[in-house]
Amino acid sequence: MSFTVAIVGRPNVGKSTLFNRLVGKKLALVDDTPGVTRDRRPGDARLMGLTFTIIDTAGLEEADEESLQGRMRAQTEAAIDEADLSLFVVDAKNGLTPVDTALAEMLRRRGKPVVLVANKSEARGSDSGFYDAYTLGLGEPTPISAEHGQGMLDLRDAIVEAIGKDRAYAKEDVAVTDVDIPPSENEADGEDEEPAYDETKPLRVAIVGRPNAGKSTLINRFLGEDRLLTGPEAGITRDSISVEWDWRGRTIKMFDTAGMRRKARVTEKLEKLSVADALRAIRFAETVVIVFDATIPFEKQDLQIVDLVLREGRAAVLAFNKWDMIEDRQAVLADLREKTDRLLPQARGIRAVPISGQTGWGLDKLMQSIIDTDRVWNKRISTARLNRWLETQQIQHPPPAVSGRRIKLKYMTQVKARPPAFMISCTRSDALPESYTRYLINGLRADFDMPSVPIRIHFRSPDNPFESKKKRT
């Protein structure tokens, strides 16, 4: 992108609505409740021929530095310092407040270009608020309606004037790896090659877990900076925020998500939106790190989150966080491994790593587990190897006989990866018991080294050409 723009203003003036309008999709949560946005969220904006990086920020308020609102303010000020230009959004419908005046003074002291944006200008009675905005001393306000998309051409012109035409329209080459590409399903039936794993491809990783498990602290430790808002309060994160960083030459895009509580406890509309946003992050990710609080692990909600991730077909890694607070580490680790195997039978062999997001202990091992798990998630096995394996499995444990007739498994192939899925041609596929399917899945995990990922097997019986004749007679 040619330049970076921060959207700033007091709470509930429509900053996230404008952000969503500029990126062309609903990335930021929007609600009437003030203070929905807490972390700074970047996005790729397009506006009438302009392309730039846009940053949504928390509403600015006067607050003590150590309070939650104070830490939110620090995140917003960091975005202003990072940006080349600020869009200062005021509410033309409800008029100015003393907070607007204080923010205008703060932006003036920064000495960076500012575009004053009078949002909600479509509302009846907004003229008074629009003209009041002149008193802020930041030049002529640009009237817009972020909700209805009005005034976008004027906003484009104001940005170009503030940043300069040469800077506004500067071209920049975009590498292929900068483009988000959804997981592909272009693997063809019966393909007999086992392609090498691409260790240079950018990797999307979602960090999920219960509230206050230490997800944001973990990502901040990876980044080496206080990029995400953290604190003792549960439920600080609301939006799913993505950040990029480099690990040993590979681009990692991590998604911080809101803490996920049991559905029965989620009553507020805003929390429901946050959980839905976290679910979207899981579906977009390739590997999901499920963060447990090692001091109180394996709550019922932890198990449900693991089950959800596996049902979505994602590669999963368990991270037992707050390891710095554990005293008898060897005994606790042995207990955690026993409980993992017992309580998560559907995730047999899943990688589980003790870590401390606070101190950074164990993070290299966690990243290597993420890479190894993604390698398995992308794994392809040749048809020839699969059919030799299938023959051996049937010799060791033949399929059961149903009504005196033994089921025959004739042919096996991998139909897709991400996650690995297989098709087996057999007789009487509808009669094959679930226990035999589990036997085959466990065999695939053990013989082809495939822990930590969901494995799916589909059975198909060949069409019987005489079936229609039987029905006619």
From Swiss-Prot:
Any Pfam family hit: KH_dom-like
InterPro entries per UniProt: G_ENGA (IPR031166), GTP-bd (IPR006073), GTPase_Der (IPR016484), KH_dom-like (IPR032859), KH_dom-like_a/b (IPR015946), P-loop_NTPase (IPR027417), Small_GTP-bd (IPR005225)
Record keywords: GTP-binding, Nucleotide-binding, Repeat, Ribosome biogenesis
GO molecular function, one term: GTP binding
Family per record: Belongs to the TRAFAC class TrmE-Era-EngA-EngB-Septin-like GTPase superfamily. EngA (Der) GTPase family.
Subunit structure, as described in the record: Associates with the 50S ribosomal subunit.
Name this polypeptide is given: GTPase Der
Gene: der
